């Protein structure tokens, strides 16, 4: 019976270790897939947005301008197209580095309705970019390693830069 108990204990320990390894690997794969999805959506959005319109929004800072509305509509379409059962984009926005304030970003264009409690007007601080260490990855396609937690909840976030036609960094799309 001692041999039988030893074999059962060995089998249980082996099973627990195997299941733990499978769980860790599955979690890692799911996290990688989420990173890939949010980054792909951010890159798609960055390629769809017209940099000249963004430059006009930066100059005018008017949420009622044609350029703002056109850019907002592009973001809304991308957001709405990515609201599916297996992936749900809650927010998509464009943020602008704050002048003379390293590591700080402000909202430039938000896909949310202007009447929504979640709408972020031009110039509002985008604090999630600080916690995501976006300034360290400003000109890169980037997704923080872990879920970000902010006032709106817990998120997987992806960022992609938008460049001018001559290759200069302009702003960043966040998903």
Model-assigned labels for residue ranges:
Residues 68-79:
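Short amphipathic alpha-helical segments
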Residues 158-175:
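Short, hydrophobic beta-strand elements of compact beta-sandwich sensory domains
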Residues 142, 152-161:
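A short beta-strand signature within small-molecule sensing/ligand-binding domains used
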Residues 20, 101-112:
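Amphipathic coiled-coil signal-relay and dimerization helices
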Residues 1-25:
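Extreme N-terminal signal-anchor transmembrane helix of membrane signaling/transducer proteins, especially
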Residues 110-148:
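Extracytoplasmic/periplasmic sensor domains and loops in membrane signaling proteins
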Residues 80-106:
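Short N-terminal helix-loop-first-beta-strand/juxtamembrane motif that initiates sensory/input modules
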Residues 7, 21-47, 62-66:
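Juxtamembrane membrane-water interface segments immediately C-terminal to a transmembrane helix
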């Amino acid at each position: 019976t001692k041999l039988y108990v030893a074999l059962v204990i060995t089998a249980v320990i082996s099973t627990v270790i195997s299941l733990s390894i499978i769980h860790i690997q599955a979690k890692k794969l799911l996290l990688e897939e989420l990173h890939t999805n949010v980054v792909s959506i951010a890159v798609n959005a960055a390629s769809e947005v017209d940099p000249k319109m963004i430059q006009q929004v930066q100059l005018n800072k008017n949420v009622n301008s044609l350029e703002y509305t056109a850019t907002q509509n592009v973001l809304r379409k991308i957001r709405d197209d990515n609201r599916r059962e297996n992936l749900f984009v809650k927010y998509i926005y464009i943020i602008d580095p704050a002048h003379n304030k390293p590591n700080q970003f402000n909202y430039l264009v938000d896909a949310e309705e202007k009447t929504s409690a979640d709408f972020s007007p031009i110039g509002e601080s985008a604090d999630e970019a600080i916690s995501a260490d976006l300034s360290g990855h400003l000109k890169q396609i980037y997704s923080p390693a872990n879920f970000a937690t902010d006032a709106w909840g817990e998120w997987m976030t992806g960022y992609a830069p938008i460049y001018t036609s001559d290759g200069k960094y302009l702003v960043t799309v966040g998903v």
